[in-house]
Amino acid sequence: MLDKIVIANRGEIALRILRACKELGIKTVAVHSSADRDLKHVLLADETVCIGPAPSVKSYLNIPAIISAAEITGAVAIHPGYGFLSENANFAEQVERSGFIFIGPKAETIRLMGDKVSAIAAMKKAGVPCVPGSDGPLGDDMDKNRAIAKRIGYPVIIKASGGGGGRGMRVVRGDAELAQSISMTRAEAKAAFSNDMVYMEKYLENPRHVEIQVLADGQGNSIYLAERDCSMQRRHQKVVEEAPAPGITPELRRYIGERCAKACVDIGYRGAGTFEFLFENGEFYFIEMNTRIQVEHPVTEMITGVDLIKEQLRIAAGQPLSIKQEEVHVRGHAVECRINAEDPNTFLPSPGKITRFHAPGGFGVRWESHIYAGYTVPPYYDSMIGKLICYGENRDVAIARMKNALQELIIDGIKTNVDLQIRIMNDENFQHGGTNIHYLEKKLGLQEK
């Protein structure tokens, strides 16, 4: 097993990684910015290293500082968590070149899956169903581009090859808008991602967001751990996640899961990963692969009993998967609500000091967070301050538990989205299951009905 690792992240995921390390007897090094000295995992880690001032670019995105911290503490590996440098192929490469283990896939795999055009090509080759599209980057010949759009059928969506998180994409509903949309998306992509390559896909009007969790050891073994539904979104950011996805039959799960597991072997994948799909009219359409642990990984852990962070650590230590596909069983249902420090009306971040805090509890209730009474939420980072996960023997029980847990949760001193989450849990359409990715924005009046 690994002797000592650097946790190159902050907040709830850093604490989650630290807990897994402690259970496995792995020593921990918490690297942190000057604003994060009082973070829970920093207070609990075996060693701490301040890697720079508050802004992310000078601390959590500072590659030389993170690698130096590993060197001076004698760590053997670096866990990137999610966000920050977790899907940065150059970081993964520099970590390995410096003689450390990157807890995640190889740099070339991150690069392959990070570029949407090469990722789609690799998935098609592996037999994973993809959205009908241009099968490569768009050129300057508008006659050819119009022909592609006609073949796919309007509406289409123009996407930046290096994009993500809802940025660098435009919906086009007819020939008249096509040329301008391509040039505008190119300009946007160049500015945001330093890559003006764009491609075209069929635009699905009312899809759900369903994703498959995978684990692969890089030694020819891979498994899928059922699916999650993350359709409750606002501005392409997930708000509520659940597992398994409502209405997905065991046959459908096996069909898509086996293809994802095979794709992992085909591309030489190592670690935890997630295949994201749009799901409409009983069909899956691959959109991207996240080559890291996801925010919503706990709902999968709750229904399968598999500790995904521990598996990441074991795989990084060179061990084969500790679980076989036939040992993965889906039991019950889990729902996760992301708790954000934000104004519930404007959705603007709400940093500040937490004056009073009480975590919910009870059977089947899990609270993943770094906050405590007296903790000051800094203004420099993502607004998510916790995740509330509730498990039940079925979906109705999980939702009922979540309603109670949200009512129990007390966070005073800052504004949060707890009331929004209570509204979602009480929403009839959510309770019925299977709402699409536009549902929440329409409910909130952020999108035309």
From Swiss-Prot:
<feature type="binding site">
    <location>
        <position position="159"/>
    </location>
    <ligand>
        <name>ATP</name>
    </ligand>
</feature>
<dbReference type="Pfam" id="PF02786">
    <property type="entry name" value="CPSase_L_D2"/>
</dbReference>
<feature type="binding site">
    <location>
        <position position="338"/>
    </location>
    <ligand>
        <name>hydrogencarbonate</name>
    </ligand>
</feature>
<keyword id="KW-0479">Metal-binding</keyword>
<comment type="function">
    <text>This protein is a component of the acetyl coenzyme A carboxylase complex; first, biotin carboxylase catalyzes the carboxylation of the carrier protein and then the transcarboxylase transfers the carboxyl group to form malonyl-CoA.</text>
</comment>
<dbReference type="InterPro" id="IPR013815">
    <property type="entry name" value="ATP_grasp_subdomain_1"/>
</dbReference>
<dbReference type="InterPro" id="IPR016185">
    <property type="entry name" value="PreATP-grasp_dom_sf"/>
</dbReference>
<feature type="binding site">
    <location>
        <position position="209"/>
    </location>
    <ligand>
        <name>ATP</name>
    </ligand>
</feature>
<dbReference type="GO" id="GO:2001295">
    <property type="term" value="P:malonyl-CoA biosynthetic process"/>
</dbReference>
<dbReference type="InterPro" id="IPR005482">
    <property type="entry name" value="Biotin_COase_C"/>
</dbReference>
<keyword id="KW-0275">Fatty acid biosynthesis</keyword>
<keyword id="KW-0436">Ligase</keyword>
<keyword id="KW-0443">Lipid metabolism</keyword>
<dbReference type="InterPro" id="IPR011054">
    <property type="entry name" value="Rudment_hybrid_motif"/>
</dbReference>
<keyword id="KW-0276">Fatty acid metabolism</keyword>
<dbReference type="Pfam" id="PF00289">
    <property type="entry name" value="Biotin_carb_N"/>
</dbReference>
<feature type="binding site">
    <location>
        <position position="338"/>
    </location>
    <ligand>
        <name>biotin</name>
    </ligand>
</feature>
<feature type="domain" description="Biotin carboxylation">
    <location>
        <begin position="1"/>
        <end position="445"/>
    </location>
</feature>
<feature type="binding site">
    <location>
        <position position="238"/>
    </location>
    <ligand>
        <name>hydrogencarbonate</name>
    </ligand>
</feature>
<dbReference type="Pfam" id="PF02785">
    <property type="entry name" value="Biotin_carb_C"/>
</dbReference>
<keyword id="KW-0460">Magnesium</keyword>
<keyword id="KW-0547">Nucleotide-binding</keyword>
<feature type="binding site">
    <location>
        <position position="116"/>
    </location>
    <ligand>
        <name>ATP</name>
    </ligand>
</feature>
<feature type="binding site">
    <location>
        <begin position="165"/>
        <end position="166"/>
    </location>
    <ligand>
        <name>ATP</name>
    </ligand>
</feature>
<dbReference type="GO" id="GO:0003989">
    <property type="term" value="F:acetyl-CoA carboxylase activity"/>
</dbReference>
<dbReference type="GO" id="GO:0046872">
    <property type="term" value="F:metal ion binding"/>
</dbReference>
<dbReference type="GO" id="GO:0006633">
    <property type="term" value="P:fatty acid biosynthetic process"/>
</dbReference>
<dbReference type="GO" id="GO:0005524">
    <property type="term" value="F:ATP binding"/>
</dbReference>
<feature type="binding site">
    <location>
        <position position="288"/>
    </location>
    <ligand>
        <name>ATP</name>
    </ligand>
</feature>
<feature type="binding site">
    <location>
        <position position="290"/>
    </location>
    <ligand>
        <name>Mg(2+) 2</name>
    </ligand>
</feature>
<feature type="binding site">
    <location>
        <position position="290"/>
    </location>
    <ligand>
        <name>Mn(2+) 2</name>
    </ligand>
</feature>
<feature type="binding site">
    <location>
        <position position="288"/>
    </location>
    <ligand>
        <name>Mg(2+) 2</name>
    </ligand>
</feature>
<dbReference type="InterPro" id="IPR005481">
    <property type="entry name" value="BC-like_N"/>
</dbReference>
<feature type="binding site">
    <location>
        <position position="295"/>
    </location>
    <ligand>
        <name>hydrogencarbonate</name>
    </ligand>
</feature>
<keyword id="KW-0444">Lipid biosynthesis</keyword>
<dbReference type="InterPro" id="IPR005479">
    <property type="entry name" value="CbamoylP_synth_lsu-like_ATP-bd"/>
</dbReference>
<protein>
    <recommendedName>
        <fullName>Biotin carboxylase</fullName>
        <ecNumber>6.3.4.14</ecNumber>
    </recommendedName>
</protein>
<dbReference type="InterPro" id="IPR051602">
    <property type="entry name" value="ACC_Biotin_Carboxylase"/>
</dbReference>
<dbReference type="InterPro" id="IPR004549">
    <property type="entry name" value="Acetyl_CoA_COase_biotin_COase"/>
</dbReference>
<dbReference type="InterPro" id="IPR011761">
    <property type="entry name" value="ATP-grasp"/>
</dbReference>
<comment type="pathway">
    <text>Lipid metabolism; malonyl-CoA biosynthesis; malonyl-CoA from acetyl-CoA: step 1/1.</text>
</comment>
<keyword id="KW-0464">Manganese</keyword>
